[in-house]
Amino acid sequence: MLIGIVNLNRFGEPTHLIHSIEKLGHNTHVIGPSDHLTSIIKKSPINHWFFTGSSYDVLSPISPQIDLGLFELKDKHLFMICYSMESALYNLGYKLQKKPRTNRRLFDIVSPDGTRLRVWKSHDTYAPISMNPRLKPSSRYNDEIMTITYKNTIMTQWHPERTTDGIVFMRDWLEN
């Protein structure tokens, strides 16, 4: 299957994501941010799209943002990673908060059923559960929303392409 990637990275290709998708037996097509992104994805024969993380500050007016029209593309399946999740939630009107970035990258997150996943995260902006009571995360780390579903989209505040548990999570999403 051909998988689309919207590369929001400031510098370079999302090589970890590309390699992880290819290891799962799929080919990739990478595009950059565009003012016409929703139209491009709508017209594309590709049905599964990943949106990368980024080192941009999502709260900056010059940073690329997720277009809310993407959530109306019912025949497309979207997977937004880290920065992309922050941008989507911010543009949907949810509250974000800053925290100091840490050098620690591997964390265990917990789903409502108690399942633990080993994940890689590197963000300093996040959506606090306590400030967004309408959101129902499917996994969390302390007060941070780590995984959430909205319409046609799964969003992770972590990078699934960086751990075995994350790659399994990606595989399951692609197969369902």
Locations of regions flagged by a protein language model:
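Amide-donor transfer/coupling interface in amidating biosynthetic enzymes
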Residues: 2-24, 34, 45, 97-176
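Short amphipathic alpha-helical surface micro-motifs
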Residues: 12-13, 89-91
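Flexible gly/pro-rich beta->alpha loop and the following alpha-helix that scaffold active-site loops
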Residues: 22-80, 85, 92
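Short catalytic/ligand-binding loop motif for oxyanion handling, primarily in non-cytosolic enzymes
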Residues: 58, 87-90, 128-130, 164
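Residue-level detector of intrinsically disordered/flexible regions characterized by low predicted structural confidence
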Residues: 78, 89, 97-99
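Long, contiguous hydrophobic alpha-helical segments, chiefly transmembrane helices and signal peptides
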Residues: 83, 87, 156-158
